[in-house]
Amino acid sequence: MSREVYICDAVRTPIGRFGGSLAAVRADDLAAVPVKALVERNPQVDWSQLDEVYLGCANQAGEDNRNVARMALLLAGLPDSVPGVTLNRLCASGMDAVGTAFRAIASGEAELVIAGGVESMSRAPYVMGKADSAFGRGQKIEDTTIGWRFINPLMKAQYGVDAMPETADNVADDYKVSRADQDAFALRSQQLAGRAQAAGYFAEEIVPVVIKGKKGETVVDADEHLRPDTTLEALAKLKPVNGPDKTVTAGNASGVNDGSVALILASAEAVKKHGLKARAKVLGMASAGVAPRVMGIGPVPAVRKLLERLNLSVADFDVIELNEAFAAQGLAVTRELGIADDDARVNPNGGAIALGHPLGASGARLVLTAVHQLEKSGGQRGLCTMCVGVGQGVALAVERV
């Protein structure tokens, strides 16, 4: 019999711009920040009884190699008896970490888990494969920041290897999402995020990152990707990235960013035993596959699968956190799900276009934000969903306690 699973605490670092304030911080150190904060915020917990640390991370080609979850928990000061594992479903890695924790606890295999995600896109290295022969000269240097590398020729022949902005333009073409609508969606995200930041909403979920340097310490305590003063006119002037007849621009797409997130999940027994406060209940998670060329539409079948499983409808949710990989896919997804473009439930404090998209952390960030927003608004249920590179979608639902 499945057991109820609760989210008891959740924090994140600020989200840094590419090459910004967090670029000097290693991914394993960055991942340790929110994990350590959870430990310090909950001193009554016997952390030697933590069953697992699940962290999502998408790239894993640099300092985030060798199981960054395990390294992060050790760097955070947890006992070496606590195990950790890194999950990779690209953009949804952090959401998968939360979902994996949920399933472990629901099945009775775990009682107390930390889940979350991390990505340092600024520090993603250039890599090169080994030569096929001695002194070979055909090697190619690959940028691991985002997108395809070491492409399988069969994959390319069968499915194509469209870059992420190309997949967004494919969705815009297939679902008739105009440039004007995309720019309006992006402006809404920036304005809402700007208002939320000015009101101090994000301060409730952020733990500062302290960076030590030759001239002393620098404290990073606020998201730095936002452009709340942008306008429709400014967005309209940006050139499409895939050619003049296309619609996706740097202004209506998410950023390339750095950040990390961690949440405590527990069974009812662990909540009582460790003196935790149950803030939200995880209702379930679902995933689905779509054609890689239109990966951005992936949330639609994932949400439908989850809602059918839970016997709920979109109307039953008070907060909908949709990862804004691109405005084109965000609008296509909401329209396919019967959600109005101006529905106030969707990303009420802005989304990834404004806040940024540190790949492995973003899915966990959606869950964290949904829990905070439900508490702030008094809503009951939150729906979190996101598209995934190579053609997938993931959705996860929570309910305020």
From Swiss-Prot:
PROSITE patterns xrefs: THIOLASE_1, THIOLASE_2, THIOLASE_3
Keyword Transferase: yes
E.C. number: 2.3.1.174
Domain of life: Bacteria
Keywords, sorted A to Z: Acyltransferase, Aromatic hydrocarbons catabolism, Transferase
Pathway the protein acts in: Aromatic compound metabolism; beta-ketoadipate pathway; acetyl-CoA and succinyl-CoA from 3-oxoadipate: step 2/2
Reactions listed under catalytic activity: succinyl-CoA + acetyl-CoA = 3-oxoadipyl-CoA + CoA
Catalytic-site annotation from UniProt: C91 (acyl-thioester intermediate), H357 (proton acceptor), C387 (proton acceptor)
Molecular-function GO terms, alphabetical: 3-oxoadipyl-CoA thiolase activity
pH dependence: Optimum pH is 7.8.
Any one GO BP annotation for this protein: beta-ketoadipate pathway
PANTHER family: ACETYL-COA ACETYLTRANSFERASE, CYTOSOLIC, ACETYL-COA C-ACYLTRANSFERASE
Protein's job: Catalyzes thiolytic cleavage of beta-ketoadipyl-CoA to succinyl-CoA and acetyl-CoA.
Family according to the record: Belongs to the thiolase-like superfamily. Thiolase family.
Assembly and oligomerization: Homotetramer.
Protein name, as recorded: Beta-ketoadipyl-CoA thiolase
Provenance organism: Pseudomonas knackmussii (strain DSM 6978 / CCUG 54928 / LMG 23759 / B13)
